[in-house]
Structures are given as C-alpha cells and as structure tokens.
From Swiss-Prot:
Coiled coil regions in record: none
Protein name: Non-specific lipid-transfer protein
Molecular function via GO: lipid binding
Keyword Transport recorded: yes
UniProt keyword list: Allergen, Lipid-binding, Transport
Family: Belongs to the plant LTP family.
Lineage start: Eukaryota, Viridiplantae, Streptophyta, Embryophyta, Tracheophyta
C-alpha cells in the first residue's frame, strides 16, 4: 500500500 507513517488513518483500509 502507499502509506506514510503520518497518514495511517487512510492506510488502515488500504493495507
């Protein structure tokens, strides 16, 4: 997934 440590919120569902 394309995630940053500072943007985990939108990432949680993208992983």
């Amino acid at each position: 997934a394309t995630c940053s440590a500072s943007q985990l919120s939108p990432c949680l569902g993208a992983i």
